[in-house]
């Protein structure tokens, strides 16, 4: 691996080893890095970092693409069922790869239940929809999930219950789900950055879940004086998640807390935490709310190409369904 990186200008065996230790295992990782990130590595100057990045971008053929090429790339997108046909319809077929989907809502609105159900559905071939002309079939073989839990709400027994409700082995789902408990924002960001190591180790990570995205940031950065620092850090985290989605054709799901809108006289009285940083970085944004009994309402209110719409789904003992 170090021999490959030495093809870059100014990168000898020693520098290559430092890059690998820092997680820069291939040209694409270097090509999508910033000069500041590379200069954090001992012995790499700004000038050397700029040369490395430009050379890596040339080797990865990064640059302008025609609309036809982008349309062809879109054919590699695959989708995962949420468990609810109505919610899948709102999403034009299901949760989409190469994107970040946010589910925000009050406690008990169903955010974590959707995350658990997604881990289960990933192991069911009939819940995965792909255009086999655009997706290499082997790419979706033996898919695995990563679940970064920041609130201590991941319940393996609930995953087993949902799996058995669909007639599959719950142990299989758990075997293919990596779980990490993050107690602060630094741990949360580190776990997200380590996902590439899992992929390089031969794990076919196709689903990444952060539950919840903003709770650690919200707890650590209190008051207006720390808002700018919080948003900058959150922005870097979202950039990591978007990069994972793009480079590895995986689905990224995040849950989000809400806060009251004191100036809201009409309409929605809550708003998702994270402000414009999360708003611009998330591809699809849902707001969840409780309805009667086991029913929940999911409102899609932000998407690059889908209209605003709502879906009603149920949270049952067997999982998410219509």
UniProtKB/Swiss-Prot annotation:
Disulfide bonds: none annotated. GO terms for biological process: DNA recombination; DNA repair. The keyword Phosphoprotein does not apply. It comes from the Archaea. Keywords: ATP-binding, DNA damage, DNA recombination, DNA-binding, Nucleotide-binding. ATP binds at residues 105-112. Involved in DNA repair and in homologous recombination. Binds and assemble on single-stranded DNA to form a nucleoprotein filament. Hydrolyzes ATP in a ssDNA-dependent manner and promotes DNA strand exchange between homologous DNA molecules. HAMAP family: RadA_arch (MF_00348). This is DNA repair and recombination protein RadA. It comes from Methanococcus maripaludis (strain C7 / ATCC BAA-1331). The lineage of its organism: Archaea, Methanobacteriati, Methanobacteriota, Methanomada group, Methanococci.
């Amino acid at each position: 691996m170090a021999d490959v990186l030495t093809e870059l200008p100014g990168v000898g065996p020693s520098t290559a080893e430092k890059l690998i230790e820092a997680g820069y295992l291939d040209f694409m990782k270097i090509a999508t890095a910033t000069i500041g990130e590379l200069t954090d590595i001992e012995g790499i100057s700004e000038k050397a970092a700029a040369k490395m990045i430009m050379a890596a971008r040339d080797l990865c053929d990064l640059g302008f693409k025609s609309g036809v090429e982008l349309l062809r790339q879109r054919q590699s997108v695959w989708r995962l069922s949420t468990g609810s046909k109505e919610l899948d319809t709102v999403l034009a077929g299901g949760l989409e790869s190469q994107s970040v989907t946010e589910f925000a809502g009050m406690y008990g609105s169903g955010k974590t239940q959707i995350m658990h159900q997604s881990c289960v559905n990933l192991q069911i071939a009939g819940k995965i929809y792909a255009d086999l002309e655009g997706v290499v079939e082997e790419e979706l073989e033996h898919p695995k999930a990563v679940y970064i839990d920041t609130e201590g709400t991941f319940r393996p027994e609930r995953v087993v219950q949902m799996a058995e409700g669909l007639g599959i082995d719950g142990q299989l789902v758990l075997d293919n789900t990596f779980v990490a408990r993050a107690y602060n924002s630094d741990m949360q960001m580190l776990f997200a950055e380590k996902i590439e190591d899992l992929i390089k180790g031969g794990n076919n990570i196709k689903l990444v879940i952060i539950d919840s995205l903003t709770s650690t940031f919200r707890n650590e950065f209190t008051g207006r004086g720390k808002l700018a620092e919080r948003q900058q850090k959150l922005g870097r985290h979202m950039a990591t998640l978007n990069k994972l989605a793009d480079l590895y054709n995986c689905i990224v799901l995040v849950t989000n807390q809400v806060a009251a809108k004191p100036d809201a006289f009409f309409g929605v009285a809550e708003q998702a935490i994270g402000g414009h940083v999360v708003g611009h970085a998330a591809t699809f944004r849902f707001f969840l709310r409780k309805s009667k009994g086991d029913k929940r309402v999911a409102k899609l209110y932000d998407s690059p190409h889908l209209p605003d719409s709502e879906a009603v789904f149920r949270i049952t003992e067997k999982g998410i369904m219509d």
